[in-house]
Amino acid sequence: MSDQSSEPLDSSLRQAVVPDSAAGRRFDAVLAELFPEFSRSRLSEWIKSGDALLDGETARPRDTLRGGETVQVQVVLETQTHAAPQDIPLNVLYEDDHVLVIDKPAGLVVHPGAGNPDGTLVNALLFRDPNLAAVPRAGVVHRLDKDTSGVMVVARTLQAQTALVEQLSARDVHRQYLAVVVGALVSGGTADAPIDRHPRDRLKMAVRDDGRDAVTHYRLRERFRAHTALECRLETGRTHQIRVHMAHLKSPIVGDPLYGGALKLPKGATDTLVAELRGFKRQALHAETLEFLHPVSGEPIRASAPVPEDLQRLMSALREDSARAAELARR
């Protein structure tokens, strides 16, 4: 807006001067630019509750400014989560005062809920940084399924949370996944199919004409005899998106308990591959890279999470099985 910025008067009161360039504009719009660390909805609530004052007086969101007014905001940061902090180890890939980037292991639930009241990522985050209790969802701005591993970004401040949510909404956050699917695909492509809740099974999502738009781009990373390793890039971020799209394409993700169907063993598979496929009890899906703009500096950040051991073993077994089949075919 200009070089005018808000300044803390104490732990809960912020003040700023409306620049002359804002003359003729609405109070709520200018307030959002003066205090970008807070969401528009939160600022609107504070205007209505009288916690955002214009020259010491209450004002309406639509009131027109003339420039030069003093704005004061009484920050009311109620606790956003009542989850208990728990000392759960986190694999941190990047950290500063505004964001935390982690490599989430498979098996770790993100949010507490029915069946998982604790032992979640949120519990771990609150132990690492108690201030996250005042940030919506303890700073979690996107999620990974329990049994999907890989990179996630967490906002440590309201300003970071607001900026990252805006980037996600604008589809400016780039996410790439490694997926091992059933079937030897011959080419990559794009799955452009809307997704919504399954009409009968409430635990599942499904491709539906009346669903929300969902787009997944995928390309071949490595072909095996009866499976394929794909690099999947999300354009949207629907629940179970890659899992649903791959199942819709008749190439479900290996080990997927919801969408994978019955276990399929390639004819003549090596004993090692049979053991790996039978023992792989989660979807073979890993969030490998995440790219976003730093919510404060605007600098691009690219974080990568290494392929976990279970997926490495699975791909190694698939590779060996394919090599053995090729050798037998040459005889």
Swiss-Prot record:
Any one GO MF annotation of this record: RNA binding
Key words of the record: Cytoplasm, Isomerase, RNA-binding, rRNA processing
GO cellular component, one term: cytoplasm
Residues forming the catalytic site: D145
EC class (word): isomerase
Broad class of the protein's primary localization: cytoplasm
Domain (S4 RNA-binding): residue spans on this chain: 25-97
Cytoplasm among keywords: yes
EC number: 5.4.99.23
Reaction equation(s) it catalyzes: uridine(1911/1915/1917) in 23S rRNA = pseudouridine(1911/1915/1917) in 23S rRNA
Pfam family name, one: PseudoU_synth_2
Keyword Transmembrane: no
An example Gene Ontology biological process: enzyme-directed rRNA pseudouridine synthesis
Cellular location(s): Cytoplasm
Purpose of the protein: Responsible for synthesis of pseudouridine from uracil at positions 1911, 1915 and 1917 in 23S ribosomal RNA.
Family: Belongs to the pseudouridine synthase RluA family.
Database matches in PANTHER family: MITOCHONDRIAL RNA PSEUDOURIDINE SYNTHASE, RIBOSOMAL LARGE SUBUNIT PSEUDOURIDINE SYNTHASE D
Name recorded for this polypeptide: Ribosomal large subunit pseudouridine synthase D
Primary gene name: rluD
